[in-house]
C-alpha cells in the first residue's frame, strides 16, 4: 500500500471514528466503533488472570501470566518465543488477533517494552495492554480491533536486565563481562550486606562529615567475592545499551563527539563492538524482517513523553526519507494527550533527537529500514515536579528518602564482615585510620521490589496512548 493511499484511509477511518459510524466494506472495518466505545475494564476476570497492576512481578511470574492469557483465550492468541537471552531466558511474543480473518487483510501492530532492564513499568504497561485486549475480546470495540489488526506484544526484550533489577536498577543486559580483568566474568557482583535489602554506593569519609555524593567514591556494596580488596568491581552488567545496537546508523557518534551535549555519554561508550551483536537484538531484528508491521511502539521510562524519529538527526523537510515524520509528529501529540487525559499527569511529545541525539535505536531502525511508523512512549518519571516546565513532567508520587548510613572501621568488621585494612578503592587506596564508609542508597534502588503508586492508572493511560496510535493506522 503506498503512502498516499494509507494516509487517505487514515483520514477516512478517523472521520468514521469521530462520527461513531461503522465503515462500509470489509467485516473488520464494519466492526469499528467510536473511541468513546472503548471499555475501560473487562466485564469478567478469570481467576487465573486476576492480576494486581500495582504489584511488581518477577519475569517468571510474567511468563505465567502470558501463558494464562494464551490458555484462557486460545482462539485469539498465540504465544511463542522469538529467541533467547544470554542467560537462556525466552523472549516471549503474544500475538493477538481474530485468527479466522487472513493476516494479509490486517494491519500489523508491534508493542515492545523493557529493552532497558530497570524500566519495569514499561513491561507492566505492555502486559496490561495484552491483558485488556484478551479479557475484553467479547466487547464490540475490541472485536473490531482484532478483526482489523494483528497485535504483537513483546513485553520484555531484556529479561536478564529485568531480573537483575530486583537487585539494583540495571539498564543494560547481561552479556558476560570481565570488568576487573581477572578472567572470571561477573566475579564480584553487588550483594546486600547491611540487612536493609538494598544495594548501596560506598563513599569514604569520617563520621562527622556531611554525607553527600561529593565525598570520594570507594566502591559498591559487595562482600568482595573475588577477594581483590575492591568492592563490587565486576558486577552483573554488560555496560552496553541494547537500544544503541540496532543495525541502522550504528555508532554514528564516535569518540570525536564525546564532548558534545549528551551524545558521547549515550552513544559511543555503550554501543558495543558492532551492530546487532546481541542475541536479543538479533531476534528482534529477525522478527521485524519476517513479520509485516505498519506501526510499532517501544515502551520506556525516564520521562513522560511520546517520541518519534529521528533519534540520530533532526527532521529535514527536503529529505524524502522524512516524508512520514509529520504524520508521526501529529500522532505522537495525540498519543501524549490521550495518556495525559486518562492519568491526569503531564505528558508531551517531541522528536527523539530533540530530547537528545542517539543512534541505532529501535524506532530509527524500524522506520529507516522498513518504513514502519515508530514511536517511543516514556510512561513514567518518578517523583514530583518542582519547575512547572513541560519537560519536567513527573508521576507526582512520593519516593523513598535517600538514605545515608555511616560505618566505622569497627562496624565494617563486626557488622559488614569486611576487613577494613584489606579493602581499597579502585586506585588501591585504603581507608585512613580515622575513616569509615558512608553507605548511600538512592530512592530508585529502594524501589527494586515494588511498583510506583497508581501504576494501575499508568498502565491504563499507556493503553489509551497505544490505542490512539493504533487507530491512526489504516486497517488492511
What are these regions (language model features)?
Residues 25-27:
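Bacterial signal peptide processing site
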Amino acid at each position: 500500500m503506498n503512502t498516499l493511499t494509507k494516509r487517505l484511509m487514515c483520514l477516512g477511518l478517523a472521520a468514521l471514528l469521530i462520527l461513531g459510524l461503522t465503515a462500509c466494506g470489509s467485516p473488520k472495518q464494519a466492526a469499528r466503533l467510536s473511541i468513546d466505545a472503548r471499555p475501560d475494564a473487562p466485564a469478567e476476570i478469570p481467576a487465573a488472570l486476576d492480576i494486581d497492576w500495582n504489584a511488581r512481578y518477577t519475569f517468571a511470574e510474567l511468563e505465567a501470566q502470558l501463558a494464562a492469557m494464551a490458555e484462557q483465550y486460545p482462539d485469539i492468541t498465540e504465544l511463542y518465543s522469538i529467541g533467547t537471552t544470554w542467560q537462556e531466558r525466552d523472549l516471549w511474543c503474544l500475538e493477538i488477533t481474530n485468527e479466522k480473518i487472513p493476516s494479509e487483510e490486517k494491519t500489523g501492530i508491534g508493542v515492545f517494552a523493557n529493552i532497558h532492564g530497570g524500566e519495569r513499568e514499561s513491561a507492566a504497561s505492555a502486559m496490561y495492554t495484552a491483558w485488556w485486549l484478551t479479557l475484553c475480546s467479547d466487547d464490540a470495540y475490541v472485536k473490531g480491533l482484532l478483526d482489523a489488526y494483528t497485535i504483537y506484544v513483546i513485553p520484555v526484550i531484556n529479561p536478564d536486565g529485568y531480573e537483575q533489577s530486583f537487585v539494583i536498577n540495571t539498564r543494560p543486559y547481561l552479556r558476560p563481562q570481565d570488568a576487573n580483568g581477572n578472567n572470571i566474568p561477573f566475579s564480584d557482583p553487588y550483594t546486600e550486606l547491611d540487612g536493609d535489602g538494598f544495594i548501596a554506593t560506598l563513599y569514604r569519609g569520617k563520621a562527622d562529615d556531611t554525607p553527600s555524593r561529593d565525598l570520594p567514591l570507594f566502591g559498591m556494596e559487595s562482600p568482595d567475592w573475588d577477594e581483590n580488596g575492591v568492592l563490587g568491581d565486576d558486577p552483573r552488567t554488560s555496560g552496553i545499551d541494547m537500544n544503541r545496537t540496532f543495525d541502522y546508523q550504528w555508532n554514528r557518534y564516535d569518540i570525536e563527539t564525546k564532548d558534545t551535549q549528551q551524545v558521547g555519554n549515550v552513544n559511543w561508550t555503550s554501543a558495543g563492538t558492532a551492530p546487532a551483536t546481541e542475541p536479543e537484538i538479533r531476534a528482534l531484528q529477525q522478527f521485524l524482517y519476517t513479520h509485516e508491521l505498519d506501526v510499532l511502539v517501544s515502551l520506556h521510562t525516564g520521562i513522560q513523553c511520546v517520541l518519534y524519529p529521528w533519534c540520530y538527526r533532526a527532521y529535514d523537510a527536503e529529505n524524502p526519507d522524512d516524508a512520514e515524520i509529520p504524520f508521526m509528529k501529529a500522532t505522537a501529540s495525540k498519543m501524549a494527550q490521550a495518556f495525559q487525559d486518562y492519568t491526569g499527569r503531564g505528558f508531551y511529545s517531541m522528536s527523539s533527537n530533540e530530547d537528545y541525539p542517539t543512534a541505532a535505536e529501535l524506532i530509527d531502525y524500524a522506520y529507516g529500514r522498513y518504513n514502519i511508523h515508530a514511536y517511543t512512549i516514556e510512561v513514567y518519571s518518578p517523583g514530583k515536579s518542582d519547575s512547572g516546565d513541560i519537560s519536567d513532567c513527573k508521576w507526582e508520587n512520593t519516593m523513598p528518602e535517600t538514605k545515608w548510613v555511616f560505618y566505622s572501621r569497627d562496624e565494617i568488621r563486626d557488622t559488614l564482615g569486611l576487613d577494613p585494612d584489606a579493602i581499597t578503592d579502585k586506585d588501591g587506596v585504603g581507608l585512613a585510620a580515622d575513616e569509615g564508609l558512608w553507605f548511600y542508597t538512592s530512592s530508585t534502588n529502594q524501589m527494586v521490589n515494588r511498583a510506583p503508586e497508581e501504576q494501575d492508572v499508568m498502565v491504563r493511560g499507556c493503553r489509551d496512548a497505544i490505542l490512539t496510535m493504533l487507530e491512526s493506522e489504516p486497517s488492511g
